[in-house]
Amino acid sequence: AFSGILADADVAAALKACEAADSFNYKAFFAKVGLTAKSADDIKKAFFVIDQDKSGFIEEDELKLFLQVFSAGARALTDAETKAFLKAGDSDGDGAIGVDEWAALVKA
């Protein structure tokens, strides 16, 4: 899903680092997969991969399954992780993360 954007080894290492429930930290994850160092274009491409229903927003249900977008065998985020992730990214309070909010979150 992220070929040409992220290195497989970086993705594997990032997923391994948050295998345990409630160990997910979006800043650490973005750094480990190499997303924070990417161009604005690549960060937008990643958004559209994660926006599974192509609504133009990443909703709570998509955030819950965020890790599985990187690897089908990865765990779902816990409710606490999902809510914290959404709260961090949803700067306008509409209950979803838009592409500009996503870009700001990745670079935060």
From Swiss-Prot:
Comment field (misc): This parvalbumin has an isoelectric point of 4.2.
Residues with N-acetylalanine modification: 1
Chain positions recorded as Ca(2+) 2 binding sites: 90, 92, 94, 96, 101
Pfam families, sorted: EF-hand_7
Lineage, top ranks: Eukaryota, Metazoa, Chordata, Craniata, Vertebrata
Residues binding Ca(2+) 1, per UniProt: 51, 53, 55, 57, 59, 62
SUPFAM superfamilies: EF-hand (SSF47473)
Recorded superkingdom: Eukaryota
Function, in words: In muscle, parvalbumin is thought to be involved in relaxation after contraction. It binds two calcium ions.
GO cellular component: cytoplasm
Keywords, in A-Z order: Acetylation, Calcium, Metal-binding, Muscle protein, Repeat
Gene3D superfamilies registered for this protein in UniProt: EF-hand
GO MF annotation list: calcium ion binding
Name of this protein: Parvalbumin beta
Start and end residues of each EF-hand domain: 38-73, 77-108
Keyword check for Repeat: yes
Protein's UniProt keywords contain Metal-binding: yes
Family the entry assigns: Belongs to the parvalbumin family.
